[in-house]
Amino acid sequence: MLSIADIVDAVAFPFSVWRTLGGLAPEMCDGRPVYVAGNAAVSFCVTYRGERKMLKCYTRTNENLKAIYGAAYRANELCVIDMVGRHHWVDCLLMDYVEGRTLDEAICAATTEAEFLALAAGFDSMACELLSSERAHGDLKPENIIVRDDGQMVAIDWDNAYVPSFAGRRSPEIGTAAYQHPARTADMFNKHVDDYSIAFISTLLHFMAVEESAAEHYRQLHEPKFMPSELINPNGWQPTSALAEVLETFARRGMAWEYRVAQMLSSATPYLSDLKRVMGFSQSPFDGNAEDVSLEYGPHGWWGCKSGERWVIAPLYSGGFEPSEGMALLELGAYRHFISLESGDVVASFDRATNVGPLRDGVTRMRMADGQERVITREELINSPKKSIFVR
């Protein structure tokens, strides 16, 4: 059997036999090629015909690779000689090198809410594109995602991907446990195999943006604060303590679509049928010029605000009031939030023990749990120094 060292030596040796990639030169450090060894392959950064490329040499055969990568996959490309002199032809992959750092590295480097939100936005954009395609990655995790300098994200290492021609086959791998639904099996192999991973990573990034302890946990251990198995209650529909913490955090801040995606993590199945629709709201630009906005209900009995046939505020809330004076008052997880119809931002939030109504004549009245009342003007809502000023 070939060793990693055998392949590294062959790539480094200038007179190795290549079927089509003659002239390829690996990047070197202290006289040895720079490489990363994985479960079934060794990857190198190389120069080929004047361009920087990624070369991947496989230690074992994977019959799916040609369908996944097309012309970039080169079967029996490199001749490798093992320590006893036997010759082996190794399958290779040559692709454009993606500049940037892994999402794992980016998470550990992020220190502010803005940096985490930028990572979350980049991931959500990539995820929505993937959900709209007919393929799936199969092993999404921070180490398999590159963050470019412009914030865009690119998934790498598609060796366990699903493409339509694989319909009816079993998956060669079932992904990394920390980012997969515990019920995923090799028989679950279609375009939905990334559903749970996408929901999990998106939730993790948004949660770390507003919960420092989750970010610090990842920096220290390079793993999520909670595992998928901690989010699924096998005995009922009530959220586990870990999931309840996430939902409470999102509900307090009026993070509606993030809240609904997080709810899906309690699913008994890896397939999340509503994920594409709900995450799609994260990519919809807000229209601050909408007219005749009214409260309407949508799928699942969730509420939002419409202008004609178009959703101005996505139907993701558990209740609400008719918009008035440029504000919509909507409820999420028993918290009420005033949302600006000009910007779409949550301008003020009220905790579950407080009863507050919509704006009338420029004011809203808040009744607290102890029976005390307070009148709050529209200007106070808009000019609050922080969105959660009324949440204890």
Regions found by a protein language model. Name each.
Residues Q283-R392:
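Residue-level detector of conserved, function-critical positions
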Residues G31-P33, N39-A72:
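ATP-binding glycine-rich loop module of kinase domains
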Residues L2, F207-S284:
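Helical subdomain adjoining the active site within ATP-dependent kinase catalytic cores
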Residues A71-A118, G168:
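Conserved structural core of kinase catalytic domains
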Residues M1-V34, I68:
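Juxta-kinase regulatory segment immediately upstream of eukaryotic protein kinase catalytic domains
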Residues A127-R148:
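Catalytic-loop of the protein kinase fold
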